[in-house]
Amino acid sequence: MEHLLHYVWKHKLFPLKVLQTTNGLPVEVIDSGLQNPNAGPDFFNAKLKIDGTLWVGNIEIHTHSSDWFRHGHNCDKAYDSVILHVVSEVDTEITRTNGEQIPQLLLTCPENVQSHYHELCVADHYPACYPILASLPKLTIHSWLTALQTERLEQKAQLIMHRLELCNSNWEDAFFITLARNFGFGLNGDAFETWAGLLPFRAMDKHRNDLFQIEAFFYGLAGLLENTFLKKEQEDEYSIRLCKEFRYLQRKFEIGQGMDVTLWRFLRLRPENFPHIRLAQLAYLYQKGDKLFSRLLEADTLTDVRALLDTRTSSYWENHYLFGRLSPQKEKTMGERSKDLIIINTVVPFLYTYGLHKTDERMCERASRFLEELKAESNHIIRSWSDAGPVSYTH
């Protein structure tokens, strides 16, 4: 039931009657807030009017009011910012850590909605709505998918704007950090973002024309040059030179230590996806030229975008996947499918966010056009929806 309440709150699927707190004060929901997938209140930065007074803060949702105490929120200062407690059953008043009462809203769902929700939850096929998709008009499905695409882009835009704020409004830095995250292709996404957040971009700009020095920055801050990580047999002339260069750059620019090397994942990865190779490709891309995001803003076609994302590695990595371990000679370029994933997850969201920020509708339309021209990702979720029938015509 709690998950259903989340959905109802997020999409503001409220009853037509005026919403009221449990003590009779009128509630107007201006903004339901940003859903939080991590620890803490369920929705951040909601905007409400309670009895005519504007409130901005967080929302917590439970099935029963008493769940607030059962989960220990009354003793957790992280929940003092909650401005409204949304529940389907009221069985007690709730308080902040200082004893102050928090307003509560009783939100009920119609019986037929609850019944449909239960049917979908217990369905043994995916997607759960599989049996009814074929009966829906194509226009309905197309409109729904378009709305979902816009919603997804707006969610990514919020994350990008947060990252931009951390980068002091530098679009190039924020773009590179996002690009790095998506070079992790899922498994190493968090590690790549952590690493990219350590990069001293202004210092690296002074050495951009030297690929070896860029690699020293990259591998050093990734923790991959540490003696605790490099086994003796992995030390070779190249890794030793990189390590010495990184120590020099550390002193020159007063750079801190590299990241915790245990954050990198290698298990079940194909060698082409090892962090060493992806870092080498990023180094080549970074060294190739500055203002990458600015150049992407001027790219009118997917062909232009793919050309800007063309990357390879330094010659050392053409016969290595790890330091000190020879492998058959092979140029480590990025395949077209990998490029398209980068476009879907990095370029398109950034173009869309930039268009929103600059009120440039043309840029938002270009982002949407690129998405429509690209083939969908090939994963079990996409395949399941495609097998359902009516969805396949949209690709």
Residue locations for each model-derived region?
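Active-site ExK catalytic segment of metal-dependent nucleases
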Residues: 56-64, 85-87
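Compact, well-ordered interaction domains used in eukaryotic information-processing assemblies
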Residues: 73-78, 84
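Active-site beta-strand-loop-beta-strand hairpin of nuclease catalytic cores
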Residues: 47-58
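Internal, well-ordered alpha/beta segment that forms a basic, Gly-enriched binding/recognition surface
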Residues: 86-203
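Cysteine-centric segments in proteins
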Residues: 2, 6, 32-37, 43-45
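Hydrophobic, aromatic-lined core segments that form the binding pocket/scaffold
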Residues: 148-393
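Short acidic (Asp/Glu) patches
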Residues: 64-72
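Short Lys/Arg-enriched alpha/beta "domain-start" segment
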Residues: 1-28
